[in-house]
Amino acid sequence: MASQSSTARDADFTTRPSLTIKRRINAAPAKIYAAWTDPEKLIGWFGVPAKLKQGTLQAETDLCVGGRYSISFEAVDGEHFRVGGVYREIVPNERLVFSWAWHSTPERESQVTISLKPDGTGTLLTLHHEQLFNEAARDGHAKGWNALLDQLEAFAS
């Protein structure tokens, strides 16, 4: 009986909504990779300035498979946010795979894959976010990721 439950849960997990965003960024893959993995660089672009209370963005990374990361900030309205997860795959300057869960809803864990490919003098970045809780979560994350990638592009270029 447990295996049936597990199978049903696994089937549901793989059929959840996902999103894929591709961007060409005018910076080398190594620079983009560092922007995702170095906490000092991460806080330079992660977050939309108009929505963040200045000086509240913090990031921690333990960059190894099984290592954890955490990003926290306070919004201008005073609400606190924290997202984090575990690194599942790391290929320097090429690929990062990590779990993604807001600490307010840890049961809604999903997975993010960042792929970086050289493209002339720049990088083709592909962000694939899968196993999202529902369509509303997918749509909200699509909006958020697009805003964040705008910030990353400005930071790295």
Model-derived features with residue positions:
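A conserved amphipathic terminal alpha-helix motif
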Residues: M1-Q4, T14, E130-S157
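Intrinsic-disorder/low-complexity, polar/charged segments enriched in Ser/Thr/Lys/Arg/Asp/Glu/Gln
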Residues: R16-K22, P29-K31, R68, R82, ...
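Hydrophobic/aromatic beta-strand elements that line small-molecule binding cavities or substrate pockets
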Residues: R23, Q58-A59, V83-R88, W100-A101, ...
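Hydrophobic pocket/interface hotspot
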Residues: I32, L42, Y69, Y87, ...
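Short beta-edge strand/loop motif at the mouth of beta-sheet-based domains
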Residues: T20-I21, E40-H80
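Beta-strand/loop substructures that line and gate deep hydrophobic ligand-binding cavities in soluble
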Residues: R95-N146
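A short, structured loop/turn motif at beta-sheet edges
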Residues: P29-A30, C64, R88-E94, S115-L124, ...
